[in-house]
Amino acid sequence: MISFLVQKSEAKYWKDVVQNKNKFLKNIGIISGPKLVDTYSNQFEADFLKKCVLIPTSYNKEDLPKDILDCPRIYLIEEEVKSVQTDEKLQIKVLRYVSQILHTTVSEEQYPVPSRFVIYPPLALLSLNSFGTKEWHLFFQSYANVDVKAGLFDIFAREWNVSHIAINEPIPVGDVMRRPLSLKPLYGDFGVLIDGNPSEQDFQKAFWVSCRQNGIYQTWAPLYTMFSRGNSIEKARVLNFSYIKDEIIADLYAGIGYFTFSYVKAGASTVFCWEINPWSVEALRRAALKNGWSIYVVRNGENYEFKVGTHRIVVFLESNVYAAERFSKMNISARHINLGMLPSSEKSWSTATSILKRESHSFIHVHENVKDEDIETYSSEVNSCFSKMLAKNTVCVTNCVKSFSPRVSHIVYDIETV
């Protein structure tokens, strides 16, 4: 299900648009205020959310009209939303349990349940401000007893049909490995946190979750790797790129395969990936095989001899600073290069230009966090920079993925050679 996050000033307009198409979910209704802030504070800044409302719709990504898909004033959020009735039933069960523990009457205002969340089977991932009232804080401080907390979260787990529950917190900006260092497990066995390079046994013992987006299976170990559901629209856009079929692609920040898999599904001959987090590489490997795509992992210092058609995905477990040397030895170049690193991918720009195919209609997709007032100006600067580095004429198309914080957006600049 797709929900529209829009400015309050445009709420009536977009609600009418959705209602006229019989896509508005009346049983859920428009969401705003503290509930909206509580649910999405791990994706957007609170000050930004206070100016917005969320309009729930019955749209799927596949049937979104192009005018909505391309509208820069809408932030599209993909999720499963529970019905209000389910929330009420769960709330009653939780209040009854807390009341029995405290031996007193309690209220929903004191002990609200997380009403919106994301499920990645078998994990329920809650927003940062879940259980944020002073009463909840005092309850967890006073009843640190494992049995009491387990009894409480048993109720949630049964209601949501999950075996694990955790609170999601933002990825530290300076962590280049993009690890969920602040993930807070609440319920279920997440395994022992491993420092250093993991072994095959460590991979086998770890807790893994999964989901499907655009028909593509993805998996990851939530203690060690992140998953960004906010990129689903950009992943869908990649599926429709021109000049992918039977081409060589480079993904210099592969992660668990966010964009890699879209290129493969779109018909790329081989996608060459770089990733420094071994847990992300293992996640990418597992999901590729589940999707039926051949994959080969190359560690730093190992040789790789490229043969056309051998593997759909080749992952180098090393820094992308070695990408130019690898491509030179293989005597190949890339038609599309994905630079999916935030807040900026600038450190890899030079590498990208060195491995790009020197023909018309070659592309570098540059991901950046940009202040809203600077988006167009920065587009010209990025295009000029790449044109100089490539010594070729280029054009730049600007694509807004989502709001990153107030007045800052995740932008993808498509640089194309002409």
Curated annotation (Swiss-Prot):
InterPro entries: MeTrfase_TRM5/TYW2, SAM-dependent_MTases_sf, TRM5-TYW2-like_MTfase, tRNA_wybutosine_synth_prot_2. One of its GO terms (cellular component) is nucleus. The keyword tRNA processing applies. One of its GO terms (biological process) is tRNA methylation. It holds the Pfam family TRM5-TYW2_MTfase. Pathway: tRNA modification; wybutosine-tRNA(Phe) biosynthesis. Signal peptide: none annotated. It is found in: Cytoplasm; Nucleus. S-adenosyl-L-methionine binds at S228, K235, E275, I276, E302, N303. It catalyses: 4-demethylwyosine(37) in tRNA(Phe) + S-adenosyl-L-methionine = 4-demethyl-7-[(3S)-3-amino-3-carboxypropyl]wyosine(37) in tRNA(Phe) + S-methyl-5'-thioadenosine + H(+). GO terms for molecular function: S-adenosylmethionine-dependent methyltransferase activity; tRNA 4-demethylwyosine alpha-amino-alpha-carboxypropyltransferase activity; tRNA methyltransferase activity. It comes from the Eukaryota. Keywords: Cytoplasm, Nucleus, S-adenosyl-L-methionine, Transferase, tRNA processing. Its EC number is 2.5.1.114. S-adenosyl-L-methionine-dependent transferase that acts as a component of the wybutosine biosynthesis pathway. Wybutosine is a hyper modified guanosine with a tricyclic base found at the 3'-position adjacent to the anticodon of eukaryotic phenylalanine tRNA. Belongs to the class I-like SAM-binding methyltransferase superfamily. TRM5/TYW2 family. This is tRNA wybutosine-synthesizing protein 2. It comes from Schizosaccharomyces pombe (strain 972 / ATCC 24843) (Fission yeast). The gene is trm12.
